[in-house]
Swiss-Prot record:
Residues 515-529 are annotated as: Linker. Ca(2+) 1 binds at D658, N661. This is Calpain-2 catalytic subunit. Residues 345-514 are annotated as: Domain III. Keywords: Acetylation, Calcium, Cell membrane, Cytoplasm, Hydrolase, Membrane, Metal-binding, Protease, Repeat, Thiol protease. It comes from Macaca fascicularis. GO terms for cellular component: cytoplasm; dendrite; plasma membrane. The gene is CAPN2.
Length: 700
């Protein structure tokens, strides 16, 4: 219940703009300005109580409290490490980012790429911070986290060994922005060790809020050049690199003056006519301008004389230090990997770019209800969350004569790094995309059933199921309606996720779910309609007062169920019996009369029939995944969120729902629906309650 309330509050705050870059969420409710002012007024240096300078901040295993790697570590402020510490000197450069004793080169490569774009760097690393003016031992940074910008505060106590920084550091040793940025990122992920191992694209996204894709250049898609051109038109960040095969290869220079293991950026892609044929050219920038390509189309290559002079002037006049052209074929031959970070519309301030259309949807997998696993598990796969993608407009320009709608889908699992120290790690995740059948077109209130997935193949799917934070693929499909189904590989894996869709043209995306519905059977009978046999039975069970209390009902039903071999049950709890009496007790006596008991008896017989029919394996019990079908048979349709609540409330540790809990769930649902209907006679879908009424209904 508390989780549902928290989600409602969060949704309302997001609707008001909280979580945007301008109104970043204050991580752990720590306000940088307020904390700094407190320290300045008190004349003290900030000590962060939420990420203290203790062994647990370092790690849990390799960097755990008893590891040899953490012996002799001292936490020191930059003012204790060098005589004249600086936050940032003359702008951020790659020499500010030297790896330490932590396997987070993926993160450092992303930080290095960040230094190529001053505007984006300033969003992540506010530059008006200093060890001189208003210094209070406190610094702040901003990260994108699953659709929200979060401001993270840290103190400047850094782990050192023998007087040297243990982790990331600058080459000259007196610049500390990168070390403090790494500490803030470690804080939001739980500890430093949680940063060990990852993909550069993960860092790209957390620093920009963009969606990052990558390509192995030994196996490029046929339309890669067009993808690069469109990415540049949309203001995307493009980086490329040459793989290293050994430590000795790092920063090694090839015979044509390219540096292995080095982060380059791609800044242009043009087609020119050269000697009567079209030549595809790529412009590369070595951000530190030290070494430039000496192969074809380098600055002094005679190939430039084979193209139109005006074209040559246009391509070379804005030449920056370290920037050079090369043929696309040479690019594919010499470089190993291309990474593209497609930026969100809010990141791009210039109107010169053709911006992506962005949609984000949040969801979760919950054990026993919405964590159905992949297609290998047909009995539960259909229980996964489902999302409708409606593609309406084709791209403006066709690629290789192929028309359609281009879009990127990124499925991100949330907060898994933070859970590493609790023994958790990344789930293996992926997704499928299914074409909506014509008869269901235009409907958004139908959760596709098990039978649909047994008889329909995926139109597209993620390239693989993999245990990375994000699975991302680019697709091109004809206009139409499609259902996207995200899942873990195996069922019953709890997790939160977000899905982002970047599309060239405006498209509609939304969760697909059953609408809330209750078809409740109405009993229009009088006592005169009840047969004599049932009257005699009631008189025998009720005794002298001719009414049945919850305690008497418990005894009666225990005897009835004891005779049933097809339903495993220890009888009904007194709690279930009380809510059954409460549902039908029209006169407030706390007991059931003849008519009320007859209605209840009829309902219980119906519940038994449903329970037996849903129990296809004849185990005498029902598992939580069968509960959705059972509720439908009883007249209830529920969205995924309600199924999650029902399973959490009524299933045991083995995800079994016994007959007692099954009946209790149905009775409680029927009671709540009847109360709501009574208070909402106009069927508006909303009611107003004061506190005392809310509390009275909540303790039902």
């Amino acid at each position: 219940m508390a989780g549902i309330a928290a989600k409602l509050v969060k949704d309302r705050e997001a609707a008001e703009g909280l979580g945007s870059h301008e109104r970043a969420i204050k991580y752990l409710n720590q306000d940088y300005e307020a904390l700094r002012n407190e320290c300045l007024e008190a004349g003290t240096l900030f000590q962060d109580p939420s990420f203290p300078a203790i062994p647990s901040a370092l790690g849990f295993k390799e960097l755990g409290p008893y590891s040899s790697k953490t012996r002799g570590i001292e936490w020191k402020r930059p003012t204790e490490i060098c005589a004249d510490p600086q936050f940032i000197i003359g702008g951020a450069t790659r020499t500010d980012i030297c790896q330490g004793a932590l396997g987070d080169c993926w993160l450092l490569a992303a930080i290095a790429s960040l230094t190529l774009n001053e505007e984006i760097l300033a969003r992540v690393v506010p530059l008006n911070q200093s060890f001189q003016e208003n210094y209070a031992g406190i610094f702040h940074f901003q990260f994108w986290q699953y659709g929200e910008w979060v401001e993270v505060v840290v103190d400047d106590r850094l782990p050192t060994k023998d007087g040297e920084l243990l982790f990331v550091h600058s080459a000259e040793g007196s610049e500390f922005w990168s070390a403090l940025l790494e500490k803030a990122y470690a804080k939001i992920n739980g500890c430093y060790e949680a940063l060990s191992g990852g993909a550069t694209t993960e860092g790209f996204e957390d620093f920009t809020g963009g969606i990052a894709e990558w390509y192995e250049l030994k196996k490029p898609p046929p339309n890669l050049f067009k993808i690069i051109q469109k990415a540049l038109q949309k203001g995307s960040l493009l980086g490329c690199s040459i793989d290293i095969t050994s430590a000795a290869d790092s920063e090694a220079i090839t015979y044509q003056k390219l540096v292995k293991g080095h982060a380059y950026s791609v800044t242009g892609a043009e087609e020119v006519e050269s000697s009567g044929s079209l030549q595809k050219l790529i412009r590369i920038r070595n951000p530190w301008g030290e070494v430039e390509w000496t192969g074809r189309w380098n600055d002094n290559c005679p190939s430039w004389n084979t193209i139109d002079p005006e074209e040559r002037e246009r391509l070379t006049r804005r030449h920056e230090d370290g920037e050079f052209w090369m043929s696309f074929s040479d690019f594919l031959r010499h470089y190993s990997r291309l990474e593209i970070c497609n930026l969100t519309p809010d990141t791009l301030t210039s109107d010169t770019y053709k911006k992506w259309k962005l949609t984000k949807m949040d969801g979760n997998w919950r054990r026993g209800s919405t964590a159905g696993g992949c297609r290998n598990y047909p009995n539960t796969f259909w229980m996964n969350p489902q999302y409708l993608i409606k593609l309406e407009e084709e791209d403006e320009d066709e690629e290789d004569g192929e028309s359609g709608c281009t879009f990127l889908v990124g499925l991100i699992q949330k907060h898994r790094r933070r859970q590493r120290k609790m023994g958790e790690d990344m789930h293996t995740i992926g997704f499928g995309i299914y074409e909506v059948p014509e008869e269901l077109s235009g409907q958004t209130n139908i959760h596709l059933s098990k039978n649909f997935f047994l008889t329909n193949r995926a139109r597209e799917r993620s390239d693989t199921f993999i245990n990375l934070r994000e699975v991302l693929n680019r697709f091109k499909l004809p206009p139409g309606e499609y259902i996207l189904v995200p899942s873990t590989f195996e069922p019953n894996k709890d997790g939160d996720f977000c899905i982002r869709v970047f599309s060239e043209k405006k498209a509609d995306y939304q969760a697909v779910d059953d609408e809330i519905e209750a078809n409740l059977e109405e009993f229009d009978i009088s006592e005169d309609d009840i047969d004599d046999g049932f009257r005699r039975l009631f008189a025998q069970l009720a005794g002298e007062d001719a009414e049945i209390s919850a305690f008497e009902l418990q005894t009666i039903l225990r005897r009835v169920l004891a005779k049933r071999q097809d339903i495993k049950s220890d009888g009904f709890s007194i709690e279930t019996c009380k809510i059954m009496v409460d549902m039908l007790d029209s006169d407030g006596s706390g007991k059931l009369g003849l008519k009320e008991f007859y209605i209840l008896w009829t309902k219980i017989q119906k519940y038994q029939k449903i329970y037996r029919e849903i129990d296809v394996d004849r185990s005498g019990t029902m598992n939580s995944y069968e509960m959705r079908k059972a509720l439908e048979e009883a007249g209830f349709k529920m969205p995924c969120q309600l199924h999650q609540v029902i399973v959490a409330r009524f299933a045991d540790d083995q995800l079994i729902i016994d007959f007692d809990n099954f009946v209790r769930c149905l009775v409680r649902l029927e009671t709540l629906f009847k109360i709501f209907k009574q208070l909402d006679p106009e069927n508006t879908g909303t009611i107003e309650l004061d506190l005392i009424s809310w509390l009275c209904f909540s303790v039902l």
